[in-house]
A protein has these predicted regions:
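Beta1/beta-strand and adjacent pyrophosphate-binding region of the FAD-binding site
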Residues: 1-14, 172-176
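Glycine-rich flavin
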Residues: 2-4, 20-27, 33-173
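The conserved SAM/SAH-binding core of class I Rossmann-like methyltransferase domains
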Residues: 9, 32-33
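Short alpha-helical segment within the catalytic ATP-binding CA
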Residues: 17
Length: 176
């Protein structure tokens, strides 16, 4: 069991900023991520992927170049979901790499697992192969969000999907 000045739960934008800033102020910091990858919803299924998909669609469809080359201009005639996700995945993976490098450069300890409180200053972290406990003077809970699924909207993960289902959508997306 190690003692930290700050433990952070969640590696999304809020957790990242809290951990990095505390480390830059000379504090001993640890951060816990429940998923197997850093970045939270923003990096993995939300903001960055959705904007990357949009930009890929605009580029491949030639939308921005049509004023120069005419209304029928396209970079690629038949655009597939694979074409769109290729660029999005590149951007996502680069962002994950940046986040991990920031943590390493600032000496922030990173664990992948599920954090739970034993008491106000002690966390249990259940990892894939073991359990560890750490104490901290302060704990920041930055556990993120999930897509809203209002009960009156019939999400079926085929015709109506949220951002969590988008990257698993496959080629059928263009048949809808």
């Amino acid at each position: 069991m190690a003692h930290y000045d700050l433990l952070v739960i969640g590696t999304g934008p809020a957790g990242q900023k809290a951990a990095i800033q505390a480390a830059k102020l000379g504090k001993k910091v640890g951060i816990v991520e429940r998923k197997r990858v850093v970045g939270g919803v923003c990096t993995n299924t939300g903001t960055i992927p959705s904007k990357s998909l949009r930009e890929a669609a605009l580029y491949l469809s030639g939308f921005h170049q049509r004023s120069l080359y005419g209304a029928s201009y396209r970079v690629k005639q038949d655009i597939t979901m694979e074409d769109l996700t290729f660029r999005a995945n590149h951007v996502i993976n680069r962002e994950i790499e940046i986040i991990q490098n920031q943590m390493t450069r600032n000496n922030v300890d990173l664990w992948f697992g599920t954090a739970s409180f034993i008491d106000p200053h002690r966390l249990r972290i259940e990892r894939a192969d073991d359990l560890v406990e750490h104490t901290a003077d302060f704990v920041v809970i930055a556990c993120g969000t999930v897509p809203a699924r209002p009960s009156h909207i019939p999400f079926d993960d085929h015709s109506i999907i949220d951002t969590d289902g988008l990257f698993g959508a496959g080629s059928w997306l263009f048949d809808v």
